[in-house]
Amino acid sequence: MKIKDAINRVRWKYKEKIDDYVIVIKDKLTETGLKEIPFTDIYTVDNNYLYLKGEDTIIPLHRVLMIRRKSDDALIWKRGD
């Protein structure tokens, strides 16, 4: 499944519990090299980029590594799957 499809599936299928989901991206500026972005921060997604609400932040989809559910640490989608 493409990352765009996985993001949209979570956004629409689990919209009542959307605050329980995060996207994990590669981020050179963090100590771990990873950063979690809550699904509540997502404005939209297209074939190449993830756009965040209220910011001028645009994240290339190739930086997205996984989608995770926080409550039970379940892996919803992972790059390469």
From Swiss-Prot:
Question: Which Pfam family, giving just one, matches this sequence?
Answer: MJ1316
The cross-references to InterPro entries, in alphabetical order and at most eight, read: MJ1316 (IPR040459), UPF0248 (IPR007547)
Q: Which superkingdom heads the taxonomic lineage of this protein's source?
A: Archaea
* Signal sequence, renumbered to the chain: none
Family stated for the protein in its record:
Belongs to the UPF0248 family.
Q: What is this protein called?
A: UPF0248 protein SSO2687
